[in-house]
Swiss-Prot record:
Name of the featured protein: Sulfite oxidase
Range of residues in the leader sequence: none
Gene this chain is encoded by: SUOX
Organism taxonomic ancestry: Eukaryota, Metazoa, Chordata, Craniata, Vertebrata
GO CC, one annotated term: mitochondrion
PANTHER family (UniProt xref): SULFITE OXIDASE, MITOCHONDRIAL (PTHR19372:SF7), SULFITE REDUCTASE (PTHR19372)
Assigned EC number: 1.8.3.1
UniProt biased composition (Low complexity): 85-100
Organism for this UniProt entry: Gallus gallus
């Protein structure tokens, strides 16, 4: 057997582009796949996601990579082996984030501590259901460590009564409901707003949105079991608290109107499953709220308490965050009391392929993307322009058919068009929902200092 040189992971990580040679690892072997990049059946953009790192997390997304002939093909490109003394660094016991779970290396990280990341655009619209490991992650605080056997969900009932449920009781006492729903962060596409004027918040690209099949108990069933009535006459809210807390002990919290929480058509879940498996730690194991059609900030994670209040949640994330303002409001004049908390989100769409600046061969080009609207409103059309909005074509929509008012999941869309050599394309998309809401054509009129609700035509 030939003798191969040894490399550290740091050395492998320096090889991330064709100019520097594209290296990857599989097991303890190192491969130079530069000459295979353009031959990759999934396209060069997919294999380059693993450049400088391990293939396994990406191969796990597609079963074909487990075939023997794929491994045989890879062996042709072997150039070395990982140094045997390579080992992961020990966690820092003083770091409050030291107990956070491992993450998929393909995620585009916007903040390491707390961890906030989105899937690469190239993979975002590849599947209707987002793989758990690529689902966008929005954490405000360290990920709590929860022992399933000791977990209790507290529901503060009427008259001072309290319902305490273990994970097993939540599973056994209430029928399991399943809902396919898209969750989107209020700051999705914030980076586009920051190009107009600076904003405060994480620089999300188009990936702070993902879709999963959620399973769990109906919030309505649990609240009725706790003794609450079907309707209340005031402006009550159902408030949620998570197990994630700041250094002062204040938990993440949010709330939704009582009518939505109790509506059988709103499909609000206390979810314990995600795409057929238990919730991953980053996605709120063991229980999270899923509020379909509503901004992701209200789908509280690592749920510990549910209560009914005459007012909205007092949490700062409900009162002093996730609100939209006029472009004329700045940090000297902003008053969070004057704006309602975001609940249902406006219609949204984005192009996921091709990526900006990509060179495409002449012939046929398939443009892909996603579209979604809040409040259960179905996306009825996506218009795509190749010339900056001067002329338009209608894309083909793909997705699940849902009852009126309960279109909780996104639509994926694509459009195949002829492209001549030497043509420069300015691809634009805009979506229309069942209420004929349509995206605004530019960012400037909807700019706001927090960079939320960024829904202009995607260019």
């Amino acid at each position: 057997a030939p003798s191969y040189p040894r490399y550290t992971r740091e050395e492998v990580g320096r090889h991330r582009s064709p100019e520097e040679r594209v290296w990857v690892t599989h097991g303890t072997d190192v491969f130079d796949v530069t000459d295979f990049v353009e031959l990759h059946p999934g396209g060069p953009d997919k294999i380059l996601l693993a450049a400088g790192g391990a293939l396994e997390p990406f191969w796990a997304l597609y079963a074909v990579h487990g075939e023997p002939h794929v491994l045989e093909l890879l062996q042709q490109y072997k150039v070395g082996e990982l140094s045997p003394d390579e080992a992961p660094a020990a966690p820092d016991a003083q770091d409050p984030f030291a107990g956070d779970p491992p993450r998929h290396p393909g995620l585009r990280v916007n903040s390491q501590k707390p961890f906030n990341a989105e899937p690469p655009a190239e993979l975002l619209a590849e599947r209707f259901l987002t793989p758990n490991e690529l689902f966008f992650t929005r954490n405000h605080l360290p990920v709590p460590a929860v022992e399933p056997s000791s977990y209790r969900l507290r529901v503060d009932g009427p008259g001072g009564r309290t319902l305490s449920l273990s994970l097993a009781e939540l599973r056994s006492r209430f029928p399991k409901h399943e809902v396919t729903a898209t969750l989107q962060c209020a700051g999705n596409r914030r980076s586009e707003m920051s190009r107009v004027r600076p904003v405060k918040g994480l620089p999300w690209d188009i990936g702070a949105i993902s879709t999963a099949r959620w399973g769990g108990a109906s919030l309505r069933d649990v609240l009725l079991h706790a003794g609450f009535p079907e309707e209340l006459q005031g402006g009550e809210h159902v408030c949620f608290e998570g197990l994630d807390a700041d250094p002062g002990g204040a938990p993440y919290g949010a709330s939704i109107p009582y009518g939505r929480a109790l509506s059988p058509a709103a499909d609000v879940l206390l979810a314990y499953e995600m795409n057929g498996t238990e919730l991953p730690r980053d996605h709120r194991f063991p229980v999270r709220v899923v509020v379909p059609g509503v901004v992701g900030a209200r789908s509280v994670k690592w749920l510990r308490r549910v209560a009914v209040s005459p007012d909205e949640s007092p949490s700062r994330w409900q009162q002093n965050d996730y609100k939209g303002f006029s472009p004329c409001v700045d940090w000297d004049t902003v008053d969070y009391r004057t704006a309602p908390a975001i609940q249902e989100l406006p219609v949204q769409s984005a192009v996921t392929q091709p990526r900006p600046g990509a060179a495409v061969p002449p012939g046929e080009l398939t443009v892909k993307g996603y579209a979604w609207s809040g409040g259960g409103r179905e996306v009825v059309r996506v218009d795509v322009s190749l010339d900056g909005g001067r002329t338009w074509k209608v894309a083909r929509l793909m997705g699940d058919k849902a009852p009126p008012g309960r279109a909780w999941a996104w639509a994926l869309w694509e459009l195949t068009v002829p492209v001549e050599a030497g043509t420069e394309l300015e691809i634009v998309c805009k979506a229309v929902d069942s209420s004929y809401n349509v995206q605004p054509d530019s960012v400037a009129p909807i700019w706001n200092l927090r960079g939320v609700l960024s829904t202009a035509w995607h260019r």
